[in-house]
Design a protein with these regions (language model features):
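Short, well-ordered beta-strand segments
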Residues: 3-7, 55, 79, 102, ...
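C-terminal effector-binding regulatory domain of bacterial HTH transcription factors
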Residues: 26-30, 138, 143, 151-165, ...
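Secondary-structure junction motif
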Residues: 58, 85-93, 99-121, 152, ...
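Short, surface-exposed acidic/glycine-rich loop or hinge patches that mediate macromolecular interfaces
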Residues: 11, 38, 108, 185-186
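Ligand-binding "clamshell"
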Residues: 62-75, 145, 158-168
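Hydrophobic hinge/microswitch elements
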Residues: 39-44, 48-52, 57-58, 107-165
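Central regulatory/effector-binding core of bacterial HTH transcription factors
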Residues: 1-63, 131
Length: 206
């Protein structure tokens, strides 16, 4: 029997964890998992210090000795009431910037991919709400004129209210790699290697 501590947000728990649990039930029913959610830098620090067996997420900066492996590529989409569309396929940049936004971020000082893409063009969005819950955010849009820009896979098993629609962002936001990270000096440990392979296998089924 083995207990693994994994770092991930509710995005990872929603997108990757179901397939991982199905594999674990079939291959290693004695294995258990504990999920920890922290900001990116804190998660990476806990991996580096051995407090977490591995972590899933987006990690632009990694401590020395921490290794990463790509699970899949992800992209952003927008979600809002269909009545906000000012063109047939979604939002113009002017409408997007005039709207108020929901921002999902685990960081104490949010500065994530969407805001970075805007800042590179000298633009800013109006953020009405910042919260750390990917799976909750889409449901908060109903009955409001708020716009959410979110990683696409989070929407695959969510049932959106009829008034909401998904469209492409009106500006180029780079795709990003969703990865798993682990402590390099534990790389040859059999249990950890097994865990990482199971996570890779689960990601291939998404």
């Amino acid at each position: 029997r083995r207990h693994f501590r994994l770092g991930m947000s509710d995005y990872g728990a929603w997108v990757v964890l179901p397939a991982l649990l199905r594999q674990q039930q079939a291959l290693a029913p004695g294995v258990s998992f504990g999920i920890v959610q922290e900001p990116r830098l804190e998660t990476a620090r806990q991996v580096a210090e051995g407090q977490l067996d591995c972590a899933l997420g987006v990690f632009p900066l990694l401590p020395e000795g921490v290794r990463a492996r790509r699970l899949f590529e992800e992209r952003f989409v927008c979600v809002c009431r269909r009545s906000l569309f000012d063109r047939p396929d979604g939002l113009s940049l002017d409408r997007y910037l005039a709207a108020r936004h929901v921002r999902v971020s685990l960081q104490d000082n949010p500065a994530e991919e969407v805001d970075s893409a805007l800042e590179k063009r000298g633009l800013r969005r109006q953020v009405a709400l910042t919260l750390p819950h990917f799976t909750v955010a889409p449901a908060l849009l109903a009955g409001t004129d708020l716009v959410l820009t979110i990683a696409e896979r989070i929407l695959e098993r969510l049932r959106l209210p009829e008034e909401l629609a998904v469209c492409e962002p009106p500006l180029a936001i780079p795709r990003f790699d969703y990865v798993q990270i682990w402590r390099g000096d534990a790389e040859r440990e059999a249990a950890g290697a097994w865990l990482r392979e199971q996570i890779q296998a689960a990601a291939r089924k998404i």
